[in-house]
Amino acid sequence: MGRARDAILDALENLSGDELKKFKMKLLTVQLREGYGRIPRGALLQMDAIDLTDKLVSYYLESYGLELTMTVLRDMGLQELAEQLQTTKEESGAVAAAASVPAQSTARTGHFVDQHRQALIARVTEVDGVLDALHGSVLTEGQYQAVRAETTSQDKMRKLFSFVPSWNLTCKDSLLQALKEIHPYLVMDLEQS
Protein backbone atom coordinates (compact mmCIF):
# COMPACT_ATOMS: atom_id res chain seq x y z
CA MET A 1 0.00 0.00 0.00
CA GLY A 2 2.78 2.44 -0.95
CA ARG A 3 0.18 4.51 -2.81
CA ALA A 4 -0.97 6.12 0.42
CA ARG A 5 2.58 7.18 1.29
CA ASP A 6 3.05 8.60 -2.21
CA ALA A 7 -0.27 10.45 -2.03
CA ILE A 8 0.62 12.01 1.34
CA LEU A 9 4.01 13.08 -0.03
CA ASP A 10 2.43 14.58 -3.17
CA ALA A 11 -0.04 16.55 -1.06
CA LEU A 12 2.62 17.88 1.32
CA GLU A 13 4.95 18.80 -1.54
CA ASN A 14 2.12 20.88 -3.06
CA LEU A 15 1.98 23.06 0.05
CA SER A 16 3.83 26.37 0.17
CA GLY A 17 6.38 26.89 2.94
CA ASP A 18 3.83 28.75 5.07
CA GLU A 19 1.15 26.14 4.40
CA LEU A 20 3.51 23.31 5.42
CA LYS A 21 4.28 25.19 8.63
CA LYS A 22 0.55 25.65 9.28
CA PHE A 23 -0.02 21.93 8.53
CA LYS A 24 2.55 20.98 11.18
CA MET A 25 1.00 23.34 13.75
CA LYS A 26 -2.49 21.90 13.12
CA LEU A 27 -1.07 18.37 13.36
CA LEU A 28 -0.02 19.21 16.92
CA THR A 29 -3.61 19.98 17.94
CA VAL A 30 -5.78 17.73 15.76
CA GLN A 31 -7.90 15.14 17.59
CA LEU A 32 -6.20 11.73 17.32
CA ARG A 33 -7.79 8.31 17.53
CA GLU A 34 -7.45 6.50 20.81
CA GLY A 35 -4.18 4.60 21.04
CA TYR A 36 -2.20 7.00 18.87
CA GLY A 37 0.32 9.49 20.23
CA ARG A 38 1.53 12.81 18.88
CA ILE A 39 4.72 13.31 16.94
CA PRO A 40 6.98 15.30 19.29
CA ARG A 41 6.80 19.05 18.56
CA GLY A 42 10.56 19.63 18.42
CA ALA A 43 11.09 16.96 15.80
CA LEU A 44 7.93 17.84 13.87
CA LEU A 45 8.72 21.52 13.34
CA GLN A 46 12.11 20.74 11.76
CA MET A 47 10.77 18.30 9.14
CA ASP A 48 10.45 18.86 5.42
CA ALA A 49 7.69 17.21 3.35
CA ILE A 50 9.62 13.94 2.86
CA ASP A 51 10.56 13.56 6.53
CA LEU A 52 7.03 14.46 7.60
CA THR A 53 5.55 11.85 5.25
CA ASP A 54 7.86 9.18 6.67
CA LYS A 55 6.99 10.20 10.22
CA LEU A 56 3.23 10.19 9.53
CA VAL A 57 3.45 6.69 8.08
CA SER A 58 5.70 5.33 10.82
CA TYR A 59 3.59 6.84 13.62
CA TYR A 60 0.12 6.24 12.25
CA LEU A 61 0.57 3.61 9.50
CA GLU A 62 -0.37 4.43 5.91
CA SER A 63 -4.16 4.26 6.10
CA TYR A 64 -4.61 6.35 9.26
CA GLY A 65 -1.76 8.66 8.21
CA LEU A 66 -3.66 9.31 4.97
CA GLU A 67 -6.89 9.96 6.86
CA LEU A 68 -5.15 12.29 9.33
CA THR A 69 -3.52 14.23 6.48
CA MET A 70 -6.95 14.68 4.86
CA THR A 71 -8.42 15.94 8.13
CA VAL A 72 -5.67 18.54 8.63
CA LEU A 73 -5.88 19.70 5.00
CA ARG A 74 -9.66 20.15 5.35
CA ASP A 75 -9.14 22.11 8.57
CA MET A 76 -6.78 24.37 6.62
CA GLY A 77 -9.43 24.91 3.93
CA LEU A 78 -7.48 22.97 1.29
CA GLN A 79 -10.45 20.92 0.09
CA GLU A 80 -9.01 20.10 -3.34
CA LEU A 81 -5.89 18.45 -1.91
CA ALA A 82 -8.00 16.61 0.66
CA GLU A 83 -10.29 15.32 -2.10
CA GLN A 84 -7.30 14.03 -4.08
CA LEU A 85 -6.26 12.04 -1.01
CA GLN A 86 -9.84 10.80 -0.57
CA THR A 87 -9.76 9.47 -4.15
CA THR A 88 -6.47 7.68 -3.48
CA LYS A 89 -7.89 6.21 -0.29
CA GLU A 90 -10.97 4.87 -2.06
CA GLU A 91 -8.98 3.49 -4.99
CA SER A 92 -6.58 1.62 -2.73
CA GLY A 93 -9.38 0.09 -0.67
CA ALA A 94 -8.06 1.79 2.44
CA VAL A 95 -11.53 2.80 3.64
CA ALA A 96 -12.14 -0.38 5.62
CA ALA A 97 -8.48 -0.82 6.51
CA ALA A 98 -8.22 2.64 8.08
CA ALA A 99 -10.76 1.76 10.74
CA SER A 100 -9.43 -1.69 11.52
CA VAL A 101 -5.69 -1.93 10.83
CA PRO A 102 -4.57 -2.04 14.46
CA ALA A 103 -7.27 -4.55 15.47
CA GLN A 104 -6.82 -6.75 12.41
CA SER A 105 -3.05 -6.91 12.59
CA THR A 106 -3.24 -7.68 16.31
CA ALA A 107 -5.83 -10.42 15.84
CA ARG A 108 -4.08 -12.05 12.89
CA THR A 109 -0.44 -12.01 13.85
CA GLY A 110 -0.13 -10.87 17.45
CA HIS A 111 0.98 -7.48 18.69
CA PHE A 112 4.18 -5.88 17.39
CA VAL A 113 5.70 -6.18 20.88
CA ASP A 114 5.04 -9.94 20.95
CA GLN A 115 6.15 -10.51 17.36
CA HIS A 116 9.49 -8.77 17.75
CA ARG A 117 10.37 -9.70 21.33
CA GLN A 118 13.80 -11.16 20.53
CA ALA A 119 14.83 -8.31 18.24
CA LEU A 120 13.71 -5.71 20.78
CA ILE A 121 15.69 -7.40 23.56
CA ALA A 122 18.77 -7.48 21.36
CA ARG A 123 18.52 -4.06 19.72
CA VAL A 124 16.94 -1.55 22.14
CA THR A 125 19.78 0.44 23.69
CA GLU A 126 17.97 3.35 25.39
CA VAL A 127 15.89 1.34 27.85
CA ASP A 128 15.69 4.04 30.53
CA GLY A 129 13.80 6.39 28.20
CA VAL A 130 11.30 3.62 27.45
CA LEU A 131 10.89 2.94 31.17
CA ASP A 132 10.32 6.62 31.91
CA ALA A 133 7.54 6.71 29.31
CA LEU A 134 5.86 3.65 30.87
CA HIS A 135 6.40 4.57 34.54
CA GLY A 136 3.14 5.20 36.35
CA SER A 137 0.83 4.40 33.45
CA VAL A 138 1.97 0.84 32.69
CA LEU A 139 4.71 0.01 35.19
CA THR A 140 4.35 0.23 38.95
CA GLU A 141 7.17 1.79 40.96
CA GLY A 142 8.38 -1.68 41.96
CA GLN A 143 8.42 -2.95 38.38
CA TYR A 144 10.18 0.23 37.22
CA GLN A 145 12.89 -0.17 39.88
CA ALA A 146 13.27 -3.90 39.17
CA VAL A 147 13.97 -3.25 35.49
CA ARG A 148 16.33 -0.34 36.25
CA ALA A 149 18.30 -2.58 38.64
CA GLU A 150 19.45 -4.78 35.76
CA THR A 151 22.91 -3.92 34.43
CA THR A 152 22.75 -4.40 30.64
CA SER A 153 20.20 -3.16 28.13
CA GLN A 154 19.39 -6.75 27.16
CA ASP A 155 18.77 -7.76 30.78
CA LYS A 156 16.58 -4.69 31.30
CA MET A 157 14.51 -5.56 28.23
CA ARG A 158 14.20 -9.20 29.35
CA LYS A 159 12.98 -8.02 32.76
CA LEU A 160 10.53 -5.61 31.10
CA PHE A 161 9.21 -8.42 28.90
CA SER A 162 8.66 -10.56 32.01
CA PHE A 163 5.75 -8.21 32.85
CA VAL A 164 4.18 -8.30 29.35
CA PRO A 165 2.01 -11.43 29.85
CA SER A 166 -0.13 -9.52 32.37
CA TRP A 167 -0.56 -6.49 30.07
CA ASN A 168 -3.58 -5.66 27.96
CA LEU A 169 -3.49 -4.21 24.44
CA THR A 170 -3.32 -0.62 25.73
CA CYS A 171 -0.17 -1.39 27.74
CA LYS A 172 1.48 -2.99 24.71
CA ASP A 173 0.48 -0.01 22.57
CA SER A 174 2.08 2.30 25.16
CA LEU A 175 5.33 0.32 24.91
CA LEU A 176 5.20 0.48 21.12
CA GLN A 177 4.60 4.24 21.22
CA ALA A 178 7.56 4.73 23.59
CA LEU A 179 9.75 2.66 21.27
CA LYS A 180 8.60 4.73 18.26
CA GLU A 181 9.61 7.93 20.05
CA ILE A 182 12.99 6.70 21.26
CA HIS A 183 13.98 4.23 18.52
CA PRO A 184 11.91 5.24 15.45
CA TYR A 185 14.28 3.68 12.92
CA LEU A 186 14.42 0.38 14.78
CA VAL A 187 10.61 0.18 14.87
CA MET A 188 10.42 1.09 11.19
CA ASP A 189 12.97 -1.61 10.35
CA LEU A 190 11.07 -4.24 12.33
CA GLU A 191 7.71 -3.23 10.84
CA GLN A 192 9.13 -3.80 7.36
CA SER A 193 10.64 -7.19 8.22
Curated annotation (Swiss-Prot):
Pfam families in UniProt: CARD (PF00619), PYRIN (PF02758)
Family matches, as InterPro entries: CARD, CARD8/ASC/NALP1_CARD, DAPIN, DEATH-like_dom_sf, NLRP_Inflammasome
Covalent cross-link Glycyl lysine isopeptide (Lys-Gly) (interchain with G-Cter in ubiquitin) as placed by the record, residue numbers: 55, 172
Q: Which GO terms describe its molecular function?
A: BMP receptor binding; identical protein binding; interleukin-6 receptor binding; myosin I binding; peptidase activator activity involved in apoptotic process; protease binding; protein dimerization activity; protein homodimerization activity
Q: Where in the cell is it found?
A: Cytoplasm; Inflammasome; Endoplasmic reticulum; Mitochondrion
Q: Which residue numbers delimit the CARD domain?
A: 105-193
What are the residue boundaries of the Pyrin domain, all occurrences included? 1-91
User: Do you know which PROSITE patterns this protein is assigned to?
Assistant: CARD, DAPIN
Q: Is Ribosomal protein given among the entry's keywords?
A: no
Organs and tissues of expression: Expressed in small intestine, colon, thymus, spleen, brain, heart, skeletal muscle, kidney, lung and liver.
Show the GO cellular component annotation of the record. AIM2 inflammasome complex; canonical inflammasome complex; cytoplasm; cytosol; endoplasmic reticulum; extracellular region; Golgi membrane; IkappaB kinase complex
Q: Which keywords fit this entry according to its UniProt record?
A: Apoptosis, Cytoplasm, Endoplasmic reticulum, Immunity, Inflammasome, Inflammatory response, Innate immunity, Isopeptide bond, Mitochondrion, Nucleus, Phosphoprotein, Tumor suppressor, Ubl conjugation
Q: Which GO terms describe its biological process?
A: activation of innate immune response; apoptotic process; cellular response to interleukin-1; cellular response to lipopolysaccharide; defense response to Gram-negative bacterium; defense response to Gram-positive bacterium; defense response to virus; inflammatory response
Q: What's noted about post-translational modification?
A: Phosphorylated.
SMART domains for this protein: PYRIN
Concerning SUPFAM superfamilies, the annotation shows: DEATH domain
Q: Which residues does this entry mark as bearing Phosphoserine? A: 193
Q: What did gene disruption experiments reveal? A: Increased resistance to endotoxic shock and severe defects in caspase-1 activation and interleukin-1 beta and interleukin-18 production in macrophages in response to several pro-inflammatory molecules. Mutants are resitant to vaccinia virus (VACV) but not vesicular somatitis virus (VSV) infection. They show lower viral loads in the lungs compared to wild type mice, they produce higher levels of type I IFN, IL6 and RSAD2/Viperin after VCAV INFECTION.
> What binding partners and quaternary form does the record give?
Self-associates; enforced oligomerization induces apoptosis, NF-kappa-B regulation and interleukin-1 beta secretion. Homooligomers can form disk-like particles of approximately 12 nm diameter and approximately 1 nm height. Component of several inflammasomes containing one pattern recognition receptor/sensor, such as NLRP2, NLRP3, NLRP6, NLRC4, AIM2, MEFV or NOD2, and probably NLRC4 or NLRP12. Major component of the ASC pyroptosome, a 1-2 um supramolecular assembly (one per macrophage cell) which consists of oligomerized PYCARD dimers and CASP1.
Function, as annotated: Functions as a key mediator in apoptosis and inflammation. Promotes caspase-mediated apoptosis involving predominantly caspase-8 and also caspase-9 in a probable cell type-specific manner. Involved in activation of the mitochondrial apoptotic pathway, promotes caspase-8-dependent proteolytic maturation of BID independently of FADD in certain cell types and also mediates mitochondrial translocation of BAX and activates BAX-dependent apoptosis coupled to activation of caspase-9, -2 and -3.
The record's comment about this protein's domains reads: The CARD domain mediates interaction with CASP1 and NLRC4. The pyrin domain mediates homotypic interactions with pyrin domains of proteins such as of NLRP3, PYDC1, PYDC2 and AIM2.
- Its recorded name reads Apoptosis-associated speck-like protein containing a CARD
Question: What is the species listed in this Swiss-Prot or TrEMBL entry?
Answer: Mus musculus (Mouse)
